[in-house]
Amino acid sequence: MSIPRPKLALTLGDPAGIGPEIVLKALADPEVQSCAHITVVGDRQVLEATYRLLRDRSPAPLAHPAGIPMLECDTGFRLQPGCIGQGDADSGAVSFAYLRTAVERTLQGEFQGIVTAPIAKYLWHRAGHRFPGQTEVLAQLSRSEHYGMMFVARSPHSGWQMRVLLATTHIPLGQVPTVLTPERVRTALDLLVGSLRHTFGIPDPVIAVAGLNPHAGEQGQLGSEEKEWLTELLRTYAHAQIWGPLPPDTMWLAPAQAWHGQGSPAVADAYLALYHDQGLIPVKMLAFDRAVNLTTGLPFVRTSPDHGTAFDIAGQGVARCESLKQAILLAAELLGKNPS
């Protein structure tokens, strides 16, 4: 008995960035076409204008807008050539409208999951939407108190799947020691365990946790957080096998070996990084074109590519759609395992 293909909403992101381009490229891929019923959330004029601009420039195939199912947002926005690669408050406002519409329709049951193309946070702010990013909007609209950013990538070399959750997300580095409380780390671990068990089907997960300081504090000589509370919290955490706190610089050696298929390194089922760049530098070094942002703690599946709007190359036809493709495929895969 075949499993019905899931229904996904795919937002255009900021229309002045590469979002519309990578949407057209991803939807031209037969693997993407066959994995789910995909509806693009946005303005059809944006897709049509992007298609006209790129059809003679793009080395990769583009899906024709006429054949793409659309949920029209009717924002009144018109994509003009002068806006592409620049963006403004108007493009920020419509990208917010696309996301809000996708979430509302998903909560109403029209879709089972959402895949979001990139937005520009500073243009949201110009438009009056003071959110750190799309993740926080999703959480607020779905009334999700605890949520997290997990980055998932499957190696094309070995087939090993890397999973990295961030304990803190879009905050300045100087605020991390204050924001990173025992309660925050415990909540992140709970989110990670829940996702590994219920989303990925791993009943008894092993989780590696990075220290905050160089050498995981060196017994309090290079920082106090590990000695004062982090080590004890991890030792007494009862819902998974925990490795850590591990030195943040060497924790990523085994995942790198597993990614490249080198030897048989001891790898965890997932890795907890304590701040944004601690987790995303290794993820992007290993899997920039393949990593997917999976939001944990929501009542629906949400994925996105792990890159931004790339205004510097928008409108040139050279943007790669691989990360968006992987985001669509992962959402479809997870919904196939856990249909709702």
Swiss-Prot record:
Q: Pfam families this protein is in? A: PdxA (PF04166)
User: Which pathway does it take part in?
Assistant: Cofactor biosynthesis; pyridoxine 5'-phosphate biosynthesis; pyridoxine 5'-phosphate from D-erythrose 4-phosphate: step 4/5
Catalysed transformations (reactions)? 4-(phosphooxy)-L-threonine + NAD(+) = 3-amino-2-oxopropyl phosphate + CO2 + NADH
GO cellular component annotations of the record: cytoplasm
GO BP term (any one): pyridoxal phosphate biosynthetic process
Task: Tell me, in a sentence or two, what this protein's role is.
Answer: Catalyzes the NAD(P)-dependent oxidation of 4-(phosphooxy)-L-threonine (HTP) into 2-amino-3-oxo-4-(phosphooxy)butyric acid which spontaneously decarboxylates to form 3-amino-2-oxopropyl phosphate (AHAP).
Q: What is the organism of origin for this protein? A: Synechococcus sp. (strain JA-2-3B'a(2-13)) (Cyanobacteria bacterium Yellowstone B-Prime)
- Indicate the family of this protein: Belongs to the PdxA family.
Q: Which gene encodes it?
A: pdxA
State the Gene Ontology terms under molecular function. Answer: 4-hydroxythreonine-4-phosphate dehydrogenase activity; metal ion binding; NAD binding
Q: Which residues bind substrate?
A: T135, K284, N293, R302
The record describes its quaternary structure and partners as: Homodimer.
**Which cofactors must be present for this protein to function?**
a divalent metal cation
The name this protein carries in UniProt is: 4-hydroxythreonine-4-phosphate dehydrogenase
Gene3D superfamilies from the entry?
A: Isopropylmalate Dehydrogenase
